[in-house]
Regions:
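N-terminal phosphate-binding caps/lids of nucleotide- and nucleic-acid-binding domains
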Residues: 1-260
Length: 260
């Protein structure tokens, strides 16, 4: 029943009341993604919760097809084929296959860092490109970070964890010796959501002080946890930028923790 519901517009919405818009604690909350994808592609969802086999549902969200039994290991597979096959005007705006795959790969790597408890496998042209098993220990989390960011980062990073005034910052902070000429080793997550925010970036760099050359970029994989009511995740259409209710408090906290 839930699989059929997942394809319906707003069927997977996490919102029960309008007031929850001020306390968004999930990556998606409107329930629009799957039906939107299904309307412009051939979408198949297969899922199983145990060893008794699974269920699958395929086709556009409006055709009323019920889930059918299928063989599937525990977990969920969402397969999308022939994107924009029914909207050729949109299809011509797609970049090359290589470029589009890079976008997918980048998104998967960010997601893999924010969801250590979930395993991810990415296949391309019939070949497994990324395979991240669930990371349920600190050692396995470090191993995943090494796979995603690079072993050079993990070997030169310091584990941090600080909690005060309703804010918690934890993760891996690269030492100044591995600072980069560009910000390609910067991964920041707020309540599990990957972001790029000027307040956060400035605070972290300020925390390094004089030990980091102004032209160099710090390397980090950091997680900020806070009350969802204290951050607006709808500040930007792409959801990459956020707006903090108390920017000064967040900035000061981040800068202080990094400086320690």
């Amino acid at each position: 029943a839930e699989m059929a519901l997942a394809r319906g517009q707003h069927g997977t919405s996490r919102m029960v009341s309008l007031g929850e818009r001020e306390r968004v604690a999930t990556l998606g909350f409107r329930g629009e993604a799957l039906p939107s994808i299904a309307s412009v592609s051939r979408l198949q969802i297969r899922s199983a919760t145990g060893d008794e086999g699974g269920w699958e549902v395929a086709g556009p969200f409006h055709d009323g097809v019920a889930p059918a039994p299928c063989a599937h290991p525990r977990g969920t597979t969402v397969e999308m084929r022939d994107l924009f096959h029914n909207v050729p005007a949109r299809r011509k705006f797609l970049r090359t296959e290589q470029t589009e795959f890079r976008h997918i790969d980048r998104m998967l790597r960010r997601t893999a860092l924010s969801r250590f408890g979930t395993g991810f496998r990415l296949s391309h042209d019939g070949r497994v490109v990324r395979d991240y098993p669930p990371a349920d220990t600190v050692a396995r989390q470090a191993a995943r970070i090494a796979d995603v960011v690079g072993s050079g980062f993990v070997e030169q990073a310091i584990e941090i964890d600080d909690d005060r005034s309703g804010l918690r910052l934890w993760g891996w902070l690269g030492q100044p010796s591995i600072a980069r000429s560009q910000a390609d080793w910067q991964y920041m997550f707020v309540n599990g959501r990957p972001i790029r925010d000027k307040v956060v970036t400035h605070a972290i760099k300020q925390g390094f002080g004089d030990v980091l050359h102004h032209a160099r970029q710090p390397a980090y994989v950091l997680f900020l946890e806070m009350d969802p009511a204290g951050v607006d995740v709808n500040a930007h259409p792409a959801k990459h930028e956020v707006r903090f209710r108390d920017q000064g408090k967040v900035h000061g906290f981040l800068s202080h923790v990094v400086s320690q």
